[in-house]
């Protein structure tokens, strides 16, 4: 990532986004904030293409996501992904990485276990005619759990998803056993628009686990949820 370049921030680089709605901004600037109840400064970076971020960071994200799959408690995948499979899944359209830094660009060769706080992707939930309804997947670095990183990731999502042209958010599978996740969406006034009974066969549970379907209108987000102060 070139500190002097603006190309990596341009929404014109968005791939596989909403078909009928254009981004609301020409660029997405890195977003800086402090972790809740802490003086730790974090910065969220938009990722329109993996060519703009270090290979070492991609490799760390790849490893981190496969560990989450292997835990068998939050994502529906059964087997670890290949490197290309991960790239196709996480970076299909747009992703975000949040680092513990006050820099406005991503430096190479960092200790990602210490620096990476979390990541998420945003992509259409449906085929082109309904592609303005987005889905997202979130991942907090286990080394930083307990710092309310997940809530900050959710706030960045609410700030940036509308800028990409999305009008509505749908989360298809929030397992009822994933309390850390559903507490965030309830707190941010996402609506519980459905329940999938016996949705997942998860590790550590003897019976299939239900999943909540969440929805939220991205054109009417409460201002207090967007504030990162």
Swiss-Prot record:
GO cellular component: cytosol; mitochondrion; nucleus
pH-activity dependence text: Optimum pH is 8.5-9 for azetidine-2-carboxylate and 6.5-7 for (S)-1-pyrroline-5-carboxylate.
Thermal dependence of activity, per record: Optimum temperature is 35 degrees Celsius.
Primary residence: cytoplasm
Keyword Ribonucleoprotein tagged: no
Description of how the protein assembles with itself and partners: Homodimer.
Taxonomic lineage from the root: Eukaryota, Fungi, Dikarya, Ascomycota, Saccharomycotina
Entry keywords, A to Z: Acyltransferase, Cytoplasm, Mitochondrion, Transferase
PANTHER family in the cross-refs: ACETYLTRANSFERASE, GNAT FAMILY, N-ACETYLTRANSFERASE ACA1
Entry-linked InterPro entries: Acyl_CoA_acyltransferase, GNAT_dom, Mito_N-acetyltransferase
Substrates-to-products reaction catalysed: L-glutamate 5-semialdehyde + acetyl-CoA = N-acetyl-L-glutamate 5-semialdehyde + CoA + H(+)
Family statement: Belongs to the acetyltransferase family.
Gene Ontology MF: a single term: azetidine-2-carboxylic acid acetyltransferase activity
Tagged with keyword Cell cycle: no
Binding residues annotated for CoA, in chain numbering: 145-150
EC number of the protein: 2.3.1.271
Name under which the protein is recorded: N-acetyltransferase MPR1
Function summary: N-acetyltransferase involved in oxidative stress resistance. Acetylates the toxic proline metabolism intermediate (S)-1-pyrroline-5-carboxylate (P5C), or more likely its spontaneously forming tautomer glutamate-5-semialdehyde (GSA) into N-acetyl-GSA for arginine synthesis in the mitochondria. P5C has been shown to increase the levels of reactive oxygen species (ROS) in the cell by inhibiting the function of the respiratory chain in the mitochondria. The enzyme is able to reduce intracellular ROS levels under P5C-induced oxidative stress and protects cells from damage by oxidative stress.
Residue ranges of domain N-acetyltransferase in the record: 65-219
Domain of life from the UniProt record: Eukaryota
Compartmental location: Cytoplasm; Mitochondrion
PTM field: Not glycosylated.
Gene encoding the protein: MPR1
């Amino acid at each position: 990532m070139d500190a002097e370049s603006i190309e990596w921030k341009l929404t014109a680089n968005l791939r596989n986004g909403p078909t009928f709605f254009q981004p609301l901004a020409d660029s997405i600037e890195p977003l800086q904030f402090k972790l809740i109840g802490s003086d730790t400064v974090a910065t969220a970076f938009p990722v329109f293409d993996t060519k703009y971020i270090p290979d070492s960071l991609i490799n760390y994200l790849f490893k981190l996501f496969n560990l989450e799959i292997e835990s068998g408690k939050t994502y529906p995948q059964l087997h670890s992904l290949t490197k290309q499979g991960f790239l196709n899944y996480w970076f299909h359209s747009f992703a975000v990485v949040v680092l513990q830094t006050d820099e406005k660009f991503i430096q190479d060769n960092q200790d990602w276990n210490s620096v990476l706080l979390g990541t998420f992707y945003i992509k259409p939930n449906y085929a082109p005619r309904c592609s303005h309804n987005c889905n997202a997947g979130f991942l907090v670095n286990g080394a930083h759990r307990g710092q309310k990183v997940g809530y900050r990731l959710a706030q960045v999502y609410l700030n940036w998803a509308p800028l990409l042209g999305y009008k509505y958010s749908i989360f298809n599978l929030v397992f009822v056993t994933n309390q850390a996740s559903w507490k965030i969406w309830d707190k941010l006034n996402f609506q519980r628009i459905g329940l999938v009974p016996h949705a997942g066969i998860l590790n550590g549970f003897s019976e299939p686990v239900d999943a909540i379907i969440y929805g939220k209108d991205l054109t009417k987000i409460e201002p207090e949820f967007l504030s990162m102060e």
